[in-house]
Design a protein with these regions (language model features):
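Active-site loop segments of alpha/beta catalytic cores
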Residues: 7-8, 30-260
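A contiguous, low-structure linker/loop signature
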Residues: 1-26
Length: 260
């Protein structure tokens, strides 16, 4: 919606810069009549009409501010720019955040007829809400996170209610203390990623989140669906865990339904 190129050949959507723009020359603004804005709103309207209240239609995934910046100028160029042109990076991020809020307002107007809101995280809110994130943060230091990311997240938590931060991968854990300093942040969704130990290995992370007065979301794996119960026993609180099952997982489903 802000001008990046799309690649869907892998079955997923990946974003790339449109050419090789200089950050100082790049200015962004949300256009509600942009081809992709119009298309996504048309899809949402069709879903609203077709399902007629039996399905809740959510916000598109708008992404994180620095993640969007990386898709517009390129990850490597953005990394160098944080060192060589920090004020231009902040100026671009300011513009992206304004556009982000404008997009939220635009889609909120369309979706408010449902009486509540949701996004890709599948949680319900009476007011507009959206998972906040910065996957780019795995490549920057704690000091740079405070300089380029934290204030935007703080504003997000003040503007929107029930905000959950998507903390993605062990490389991002160094920013947890700063995230927990956000007074109005509601919860942290810890995604430990592939190829690393699952939820039970991260008890200290969940405890730290709870001790800061935040809720936590466990991204569960189908191989061990009861692991969430073990985490709850040790950490406490009421985590949210989403488990995607197929028809072939009937044995696991029956165990869950009969579990006490």
């Amino acid at each position: 919606m802000l001008g990046a190129k799309l690649d869907t050949s892998s079955g997923r959507v990946w974003f790339f810069p449109n050419g090789d723009p200089e950050i100082s020359e790049l200015h962004v603004k949300y256009d509600p009549n942009n081809m992709w804005s119009t298309r996504m709103k048309a899809i949402a309207r069709t879903a609203l009409d077709y399902f007629d209240g039996s399905v809740l239609v959510g916000f598109p995934d708008f992404g994180g501010i620095l993640d969007i910046a990386a898709s517009l100028v390129g990850t490597e160029k953005l990394l160098f720019a944080t060192l060589e042109e920090p004020e231009e990076v902040k100026r671009l991020c300011d513009e992206i955040q304004v556009a982000w809020y404008d997009a939220m307002d635009d889609f909120s107007e369309l979706l408010k007829c449902q009486g509540c809101f949701t996004d890709w995280n599948n949680l319900l809110s009476k007011t507009p809400t959206h998972v906040i994130q910065c996957d780019f943060s795995t490549m920057i230091s704690r000091e740079m996170f405070r300089e380029f990311v934290l204030d935007y997240l703080r504003l997000d938590t003040k503007k929107l209610e029930h905000e959950i931060y998507h903390l993605d991968g062990p490389g991002a854990l160094m920013h947890l203390d700063d995230l927990l300093s956000l007074e109005k942040l509601s919860a942290v969704q810890w995604v430990y990623g592939a190829g690393v130990p699952t939820a039970a290995h991260w008890i200290d992370v969940y405890k730290k989140i709870r001790e800061a007065g935040k809720q936590y979301q466990i991204k569960q794996v189908v191989e061990d669906p009861f692991e969430v119960y073990e985490v709850m026993k040790k950490v406490g609180g009421t985590p949210y865990s989403q488990l995607n099952l197929r028809k072939s997982d009937s044995d696991i489903m029956n165990k869950i339904l009969s579990h006490k």
